[in-house]
Amino acid sequence: DYVYSSTCPCSLELAEHARATRGQLATPHSQRSVARLSVVLTDEMALEDLIELARDAIVTETQVMVKREDEQAFAELNAANPIFVEDAARLFCEALRADPRIGDFRVIASHQESLHSHDAISLLTEGPTFAADSLDPRLFQGLIHAG
């Protein structure tokens, strides 16, 4: 699993509109997000290479510990890269597809919503390996907030 943060593009646009038209301070909502990447390798690949591939696709990987100024820089990075869950899944797919060491793959992206009472999930597969079990509910364990 690759854990990243995502800012809702709609929420960001509405916050900017409120600030521009009414001078109202509004904060776009962002949330912790998880991409579960499953791959079939056609050649050797270190786990670190797969992690780097995910980091290159979505640059807002969550941080374990940050200083206050680093937290602000991360908030700015997050706001500069708003993304819907479907678009995040597509970016991961593009990165996986571009690596010749990767054959079939499955991407499950989950944006664990901070505003809505539901999570947003996108699932994409490439090749026959993962197609048959792509809707098995066990795939989503740990990706869905149960609360």
Say what each PLM segment does.
Residues 1-147:
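N-terminal intrinsically disordered, cationic/polar leader segments
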